[in-house]
Amino acid sequence: MKNNQRPVIRSTTVIGVIRDGKAALGSDGQMTLGNTVIKHSTRKIRRLYHGKLVAGFAGATADAVTLLDRFEEKLEAYNGKLDRAAVELARDWRTDKYLRRLEAMLAIVSHDKALIISGTGDVIEPEDGIVAIGSGSMYALAAARSLMKHSSLPAKEIVLESLKIAADICIYTNDHIIVEEV
């Protein structure tokens, strides 16, 4: 690491799935600083808007919590309308000098919608109802798509199994898994 660089904090696999009118979102608990694991049980997901949504984050923790707080404010302002709150947060993220510097991504699920709000302020709604962010996201996404196609597992089990698979592959993902369902 060069003197003028901050240590890179890598952590997290967050995945959410919608199936049969139920949604689940989960994450691992590992946080690393550079090449060292500094915490095994970080909580990276939380329920929002009276328990009707679950959101998870990847990236710098303080930045992500700031964004989650802003997102909750938008949800309250727009009566829980997920799309509208996400677009308004993304708009603020792109235009506000302070927010533009935040390094985080959000994944959000409700019983019928899954969204990613990217670090560039984009709002992405995947066609298959699966959202994945973080260092192990592509492993978890591949596992979830396969399980959706070839099993009848409920959303919560798909999330759990996908995170276990990602933990077996990604060195920045562990098996201290938390899953919430709506």
From Swiss-Prot:
EC top class named in words: hydrolase
Regulation: Allosterically activated by HslU binding.
The protein's name in its UniProt record: ATP-dependent protease subunit HslV
Listed PANTHER family: ATP-DEPENDENT PROTEASE SUBUNIT HSLV (PTHR32194:SF0), METALLOPROTEASE TLDD (PTHR32194)
Domain of life: Bacteria
Function: Protease subunit of a proteasome-like degradation complex believed to be a general protein degrading machinery.
Pfam families associated with the record: Proteasome
Family (UniProt): Belongs to the peptidase T1B family. HslV subfamily.
Source organism per UniProt: Pelodictyon phaeoclathratiforme (strain DSM 5477 / BU-1)
One GO CC term, this protein: HslUV protease complex
SUPFAM superfamilies to which the protein is assigned, alphabetical: N-terminal nucleophile aminohydrolases (Ntn hydrolases)
EC number(s) given by UniProt: 3.4.25.2
Gene symbol of the encoding locus: hslV
Zinc found in the keyword field: no
Residues engaged in binding Na(+): 167, 170, 173
